[in-house]
């Protein structure tokens, strides 16, 4: 048996080299279509709010159970292979499909390149691929801020959280987490359709991300020190501002990044033409620019490597 920490490192290396395959048969894409079908099947169009919540909870339970059982079944099958490392290889592949640091980095790098090139219209279009806010009126600083916030916050659910659950429950638990996070991204909206129907999916995602988000905050502070950013300020802003984020977990990723880079995140966003204000994270010592996107990506990768190293060291003694 290969230590699980080394399997996690191998999955991260594979993602770094290959990235996330863009295919309709990618397991997460297949999972998304499955969730979409259950959404259409179980949503009670004329039901009460209580019924919508109950059916949404049923959908959430079904997806979590089926996802976990699928991963467990694949691993049990792999254990029957004539090679001793078969199950380890399958675990690595499953985890590889659950993490997406390279995809996250590329999304930020694409926006950075367009902003540096001066193509604000294309940068706005690319920002629209990764956020739900209106992008038509974004200036350069707003486009960069959207990219920074996305990379920072998604370091939790796209990298650290899957690794965390893999460390504690192997590939099946990492797959279960990815299923929960995918449901939240599809159903966790506060609109007429999903306010009640998607509430359980959103709450499950919040609960699962609670510990990984706080670990990510600490890792960002450590990464800031290692990279020569302002680690002390990252810690100060994490403590001061994280709780102000509308998400119970998002601030623990965004606040230390803002502090490390001496920028201010949050503020005014527009959704479907309506103005929304989100609490500020950090202080505006510097105007946000494209270069801060690259700084956030460096923090993301360094935090990931730190997690893997700590995971390996912990596995040596426990």
What residue spans do the PLM features occupy?
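Hydrophobic alpha-helical transmembrane segments
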Residues: 1-176, 180, 188-318
